[in-house]
Amino acid sequence: MDVTRLIDLFPYQLEKFPKSDALAAKENGVWKKYSTAEVLEIVNNLSYGLLNAGIKPGDKIGIISNNRPEWNFIDHACLQIAVADVPLYPTISEHDLKFTLHQSEVRYMFVSDKVIYDKINALKPELPFLEKIYTFNKVEGAAHWTELTEAGKKAPLSEKVNEIRSTIKPSDLATIIYTSGTTGNPKGVMLSHNNLVSNFKACEVLCPFNDNWRALSFLPLNHVYERMLSYLYVYYGVSIYYAESLDTIADNLKDVKPEIFVTVPRLLEKVYDKIVSKGAELSGIKKALFYWALNLGLRYELHGANGWWYEFQLKIANKLIFSKWREALGNNIVAIASGGAALQPRLARVFHAARIPVLEGYGLTETSPVIAVNNFQPDCIKFGTVGTVIDKVEVKIAEDGEILCKGPNVMMGYYQNPEQTAEMIDAEGWFHTGDIGIIEDGKFLKITDRKKEIFKTSGGKYIVPQMIENKLKESRFIEQAMVIGENQKFASAFIVPNFSFIRDWANRKNLKLDTNDEIATNPEVKKRIAEEVNEINKTLGHFETIKRFELLSREFSIEKNEMTPKLSLRRKIILENFKEQYNRIYSFD
């Protein structure tokens, strides 16, 4: 059979490579595994239960949950009865939650735990369409999701489900994924079966997938990149193991020993910083060897371009030092897929040197999501780029530098928002990404900035903040940065120090810095970070250099609405929240 709709995936897996561990998650400290046949049985019973409860094709169902097999069960149960699911972030604000559930007219909600249940239940009187909330964990007084599977077993509507399945076309709506932009209300991105199927089939070039592989999943499944790759895993018979939480990833990696996982650059940065901090604690020959290997890795070039002597040294570094990095990831990693934000080239280099290929990709929710990706095909990796454009997708660079995309991955449109759909997809079918980029070497796409985030100084010079911020974040001393200076004489920055790294650094220098405030106001810290900024300034044009900066005593956060759930900066809100620091920078002639 061929897979043309998402509902074909598990039947295809059952036919081609039935698995004993199609999905797995820890329950009471033990891995509970679901075979392909069990997954299909649960999905069917859920579909029967939903139909018995009065859910019908065209309805919407919401999901707010951590990653777990139940997420997949609900997703596939909805898909095969032509019900679109609306997945949302657990960290969603109350305003955005009310807006999305109201606009999409969600009838049933499925939530992971008591905290989210209480949050939604409190809003229920304001949500006229919401009829029932089911939980995955047992919550006193709440309906449990298994009530639906039990009802489905008692009244199996297999004929009804098969009848609906037979009417579902690849072009039909599969899901509505809300994107929380840096301004305004969230937009509901409508993706069809074909949008997602075409995307995961085109991403098979990412690496040589194998039905003996295991994937560890921890990025939220409502993030379209993790979700699309989860469909790809099912298609290739890769077993999906769900991490217990972000805090247990290190233990779960050693336990599961996966060949692949998806991550965002920020998590890789934290892994790298932790490795470097541990290396800094070593002494004598061990410390010297660690830094020798690290500096070797940071100079890594593909295809042996550094010559035989470098490659010979790298072999030794891999045996002595980098082998321990691979062990920490379970010792089986073939590829790490990175997306959602720009990956620092130095991270790509050092992990590749350590035989841990980190493959950066690029796309948006509106493009299902992948447009381009570094991959295992010959000569299809280039550090500092997001790789080559995937099969059946076209990219062109507009006159103003904006990246335009056309192909089967481009969304159906924004839900109940034809005006914004027309703004984003032009009459010729080109989707306007809002990102600025160039094509290097005739095939590699490189992102240089967000179109809307570029600003002018009072001298009329254009500043590309994201590029400068990424350079600043390459420093081990800097956790976050935001470049400012619109309509001012010069560019400056808000800098959030890497508090844990600086505490270790301070201890080695016998400096007592207990609190974040002490770190942000300490002259020694400011002086050391100024050295980092000056080094970065040497790589920038004169008008781009950071003339002044303020150290902040806390990180930008989703809770304070300063970042989207995808960790994009909400610049206006950050400026408002740090007005005092801004005024200190620009309160002179």
What label would you give each PLM region?
Residues 2, 52-53, 80-151, 528:
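Structural core segment of the AMP-binding/adenylate-forming
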Residues 18-21, 135, 153-178, 185, ...:
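Conserved pre-ATP/AMP-binding loop-to-beta segment of ANL
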Residues 22-76, 93-98, 146-153, 193:
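Conserved AMP-binding/adenylate-forming core of the ANL superfamily
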Residues 33-37, 174-200:
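Conserved AMP-binding A3 loop
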Residues 115-170, 275-324:
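ANL superfamily adenylate-forming
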Residues 197-214, 221-322, 332, 357:
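Conserved AMP-binding/adenylation subdomain of ANL enzymes
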Residues 389-457, 474:
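Conserved ATP-binding/catalytic segment of the ANL
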Residues 455, 480-484, 489, 505, ...:
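Conserved C-terminal "lid"/linker of ANL adenylate-forming enzymes
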